[in-house]
């Protein structure tokens, strides 16, 4: 393994990044990943970071903030490259990006049944929040 190189996504990365998200099971029918990438790239308060090992995209994170709290989405590590520190490195880069923006709190959402992801975030020092998340579909679809 060479040193992981992390930088912002560029145009040529979009399709490989979406393919990685699909391999990792991160895409959902109601969220167009291409639109999510485009939105993150055109705003000053968000970006998509890409980790490369020998030029191959092996990890990603979409990171943004609302001025007070940072959020990460689409945290992905190539399934063939797990347990090599890629996840820790891409999350550290997201934290650095938020610190540079003056953000001191980072939040994320994980499905309760995703034990592997929950263990990973616990190992990074994340704590289970006492907050309860509510949601409502504004287009009339049934809750998920």
Task: Label the model's feature ranges.
Residues 98-110:
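Conserved GNAT acetyl-CoA-binding A-motif
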Residues 59, 116-120:
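A short, acidic/glycine-rich surface segment
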Residues 141-144:
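Short, charged/polar, Gly/Pro-enriched secondary-structure boundary elements
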Residues 108-117, 135-139:
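Conserved beta-strand-loop-alpha-helix junction that forms the acyl-donor binding cleft
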Residues 77, 83-96, 119, 123:
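Conserved acetyl-CoA-binding loop-helix of GNAT-fold acetyltransferases
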Residues 4, 8-74, 78, 91-93, ...:
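Acetyl-CoA-dependent GNAT
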Residues 6, 110, 123:
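Conserved SAM-binding loop
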């Amino acid at each position: 393994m060479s040193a992981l190189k992390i930088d912002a996504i560029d145009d040529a990365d979009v399709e490989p990044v979406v393919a990685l998200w699909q391999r990792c099971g991160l895409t959902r029918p109601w969220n167009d990943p291409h639109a999510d990438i485009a939105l993150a790239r055109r705003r000053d308060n968000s970006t998509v970071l890409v980790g490369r090992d020998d030029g191959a995209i092996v990890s990603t994170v979409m990171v943004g903030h609302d001025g007070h709290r940072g959020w990460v989405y689409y945290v992905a590590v190539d399934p063939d490259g797990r347990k090599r520190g890629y996840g820790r490195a891409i999350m550290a880069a997201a934290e650095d990006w938020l610190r540079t923006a003056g953000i001191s709190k980072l939040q994320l959402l994980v499905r309760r049944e995703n034990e592997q992801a929950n263990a990973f975030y616990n190992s990074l020092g994340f704590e289970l929040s006492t907050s309860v998340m509510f949601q409502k579909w504004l287009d009339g679809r049934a809750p998920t």
